[in-house]
């Protein structure tokens, strides 16, 4: 299986990498939170742009991205607009969503973009090609904050992302039972052993799914999300606790 290298970080080998999400409403908060995050122990900084109020002003968005880049130049920067339908803060048109991601790619400030699988097949394929032409990696994602489908459907979605040339397929699902967590873990293992030729990221959310955020190295998930301050999704634990557990499992 091939790995994905972003800056000096190799994703897909060793212990799962820790991603943290920065969610700030304006440039002043972006700056203050970036300074606070700089001291934390994590591997990838995700900027959740859907929390940014001045979204219609591309110059303002990119000015904020520049602050993040300059504050943490060594950290890979993942640019993510999470749509309202997949648990995000704002709803925008597909056209605006694609344009925003293209602007991020053009800026030269971001290392990766998050691209939602169900944006539309043609738009997804075109945006992946555009990102790769500009040396930007793509985390292709799907989130369901209500339920967990059968393992076969989870695998089908991850394989579709891979077929669309995502650098890293990602899926996050809400369990209604412990059995749903097992379905997610079983799907992750089957995908990793039988179909994946690149790193994948999977997680089961909420308290019920916390084990999936810790056991990625066992079942085949290459990264996990932790919290520096406020969690960006239910079930996230602090980066310090997360690093401790990931290290214990890696060294066992």
UniProtKB/Swiss-Prot annotation:
HAMAP family listed in its UniProt record: AroD
Biological processes, Gene Ontology terms: 3,4-dihydroxybenzoate biosynthetic process; amino acid biosynthetic process; aromatic amino acid family biosynthetic process; chorismate biosynthetic process
Catalytic activity: 3-dehydroquinate = 3-dehydroshikimate + H2O
InterPro entries tied to this protein: 3-dehydroquinate_DH_AS, Aldolase_TIM, DHquinase_I, Type-I_3-dehydroquinase
Annotated function: Involved in the third step of the chorismate pathway, which leads to the biosynthesis of aromatic amino acids. Catalyzes the cis-dehydration of 3-dehydroquinate (DHQ) and introduces the first double bond of the aromatic ring to yield 3-dehydroshikimate.
CDD domains named in the record: DHQase_I
NCBIfam families with a match to the protein in the record: aroD
PROSITE patterns (UniProt xref): DEHYDROQUINASE_I (PS01028)
Binding-site positions, 3-dehydroquinate: 21, 46-48, 82, 213, 232, 236
Protein name, entry field: 3-dehydroquinate dehydratase
MF annotations from Gene Ontology: 3-dehydroquinate dehydratase activity
UniProt keyword Amino-acid biosynthesis, yes or no: yes
GN (gene name): aroD
Subunit record text: Homodimer.
Membership in a protein family: Belongs to the type-I 3-dehydroquinase family.
EC class name: lyase
Catalytic center residues: 143 (proton donor/acceptor), 170 (schiff-base intermediate with substrate)
Catalytic activity, EC: 4.2.1.10
Superkingdom classification of source: Bacteria
Pathway assigned to this chain's UniProt record: Metabolic intermediate biosynthesis; chorismate biosynthesis; chorismate from D-erythrose 4-phosphate and phosphoenolpyruvate: step 3/7
Keywords, comma-separated and alphabetical: Amino-acid biosynthesis, Aromatic amino acid biosynthesis, Lyase, Schiff base
